[in-house]
């Protein structure tokens, strides 16, 4: 027998008797510093790390098999953009942009609230998840497997070459597991339903577009401040049923539209904590700016690009050829500038600013102060300028958006907008 046949018999037997080996429930957790944190400051704390669980390979193969056979039971709302094939942060960002553009073009101001959850993945209730799965009429054999699996789940912390003692996980879900993101999406799916049912969010052609999710990143979109306050309370109430809490200190409100300069009273959580209005907020890696129309700041992207280029140049700039350094710049540095640009509008001034940053770095690489020489070198090494890269990314993204999302309950509203933008790029 081949190894795959042995695994198939083992997995079928496990599902039949509702049992998983003890090793399947064991993992070790590696703390990784969050993106916005700096490892070289003195104020780093445990809250600045995200734990990623490393599980046995065979258990991951089993999870893939479960997902292949029972994937229909783990389907989440169209308003959840995370953990789905052919769906990315760019799709969530583009949908948000289309919603805002729709209302701003009709002289309305859109009110946003980016809700931050406190340790959402770590606080997920196992019993609450089982209830939600039973409501979906999940097969008893699969439910029994998951119950045994979660009941015996243990992990330890790995720091460098040191391992801690194993301890039991009474709640939460392993970040890094194959099934984990799908189970979490099922768990928070009711938040979307409750917020949509309250009817306070933005609507386009009678379709509710008041809430967008990407994993545990929740964004509320409302036409008025009062409606935003109502949606926040509905969202918070449902989250409390799920044993989850909002972090007001990291949650942000933002206004985009004709009245964006008028600052209303802060909206508050159920316990009275205020969520302040800000001039910008970070959402899925991009920085949305309050203003008359939807726009994003590229300043953080430029700073990241400078850091990455200087790191590459300091390490190998004196020993490697220009071709090697330029290849690393193209593969490691340019993606920091291009991230999310396919989904957001970019002004000509922003393009000039970014291209100036790239030119300055290449002047340093080619040891020249002539812009013409840099342009010749870029052409010789087939290094595309920023504006060309953005147009290519936009065209590729919009083609996929139109092809894949016309059946999506939410995104189908904006397919015509995507087609019009695609035609303008040709």
Features from the language model and the residues they span:
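Conserved pre-catalytic core of RNA-dependent polymerases
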Residues: 1-186, 190
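Alpha-helical recognition domains of nuclear gene-regulatory proteins
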Residues: 10-13, 69, 73, 99-102, ...
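Structural motif
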Residues: 47, 56-57, 140, 177-179, ...
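Active-site palm subdomain of RNA-directed nucleic acid polymerases
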Residues: 66-81, 183-219, 228
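Non-catalytic, peripheral interaction segments enriched in hydrophobic/basic residues
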Residues: 69, 215, 243, 247-259, ...
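Catalytic palm subdomain of template-directed nucleic-acid polymerases
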Residues: 119-136, 211-240, 257-258, 290-293
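Short, conserved micro-motifs composed of acidic
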Residues: 161, 245-280
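Acidic catalytic cores of enzymes that act on phosphate-bearing nucleotides/polynucleotides
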Residues: 370, 384-426
């Amino acid at each position: 027998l081949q190894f795959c046949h042995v695994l198939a018999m083992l997995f079928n037997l496990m599902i039949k008797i509702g049992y998983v080996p003890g090793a399947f429930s064991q993992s070790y957790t590696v703390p990784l510093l969050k993106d916005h944190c700096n490892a070289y400051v003195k104020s780093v704390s445990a809250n600045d790390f995200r734990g990623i669980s490393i599980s046995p390979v065979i258990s991951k193969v089993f999870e893939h098999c479960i997902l292949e056979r029972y994937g229909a039971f783990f389907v989440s709302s169209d308003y959840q953009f995370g953990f789905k094939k052919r769906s990315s942060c760019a799709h969530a960002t583009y949908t948000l942009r289309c919603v805002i553009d729709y209302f701003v073009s009709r002289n309305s101001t859109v009110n946003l609230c980016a809700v931050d959850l406190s340790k959402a993945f770590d606080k997920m209730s196992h019993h609450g998840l089982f209830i939600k799965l039973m409501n979906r009429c999940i097969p008893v054999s699969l439910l029994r497997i998951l119950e045994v699996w979660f009941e015996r789940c243990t992990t330890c912390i790995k720091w460098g070459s040191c391992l801690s003692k194993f301890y039991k996980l009474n709640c939460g879900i392993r970040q890094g597991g194959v099934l984990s993101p799908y189970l979490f999406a099922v768990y928070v799916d009711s938040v979307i339903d409750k917020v949509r049912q309250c009817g306070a969010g933005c609507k386009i052609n009678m379709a509710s577009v008041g809430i967008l999710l990407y994993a545990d990143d929740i964004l509320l979109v409302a036409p008025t401040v009062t409606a935003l306050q109502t949606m926040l309370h509905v969202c918070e109430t449902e989250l409390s049923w799920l044993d989850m809490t909002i972090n007001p200190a990291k949650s942000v409100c933002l206004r985009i539209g004709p009245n964006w300069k008028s600052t209303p009273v802060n909206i508050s959580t159920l316990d009275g904590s205020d969520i302040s209005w800000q001039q910008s907020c970070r959402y899925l890696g991009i920085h949305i700016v309050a203003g008359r129309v939807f726009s994003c700041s590229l300043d953080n992207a430029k700073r990241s690009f400078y850091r990455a280029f200087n790191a590459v140049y300091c390490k190998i700039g004196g020993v490697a050829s220009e071709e090697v350094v330029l290849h690393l710049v193209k593969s490691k540095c340019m993606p920091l500038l291009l991230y999310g640009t396919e989904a957001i509008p970019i002004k000509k001034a922003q393009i000039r600013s970014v291209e100036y940053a790239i030119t300055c770095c290449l002047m340093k690489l080619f040891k020249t102060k002539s812009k013409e020489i840099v342009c010749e070198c870029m052409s010789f090494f087939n290094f595309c300028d920023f504006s060309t890269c953005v147009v290519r990314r936009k065209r590729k993204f919009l083609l996929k958006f139109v092809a894949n999302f016309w059946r999506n309950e939410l995104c189908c509203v904006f397919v015509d907008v995507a087609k019009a933008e695609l035609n303008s790029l040709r």
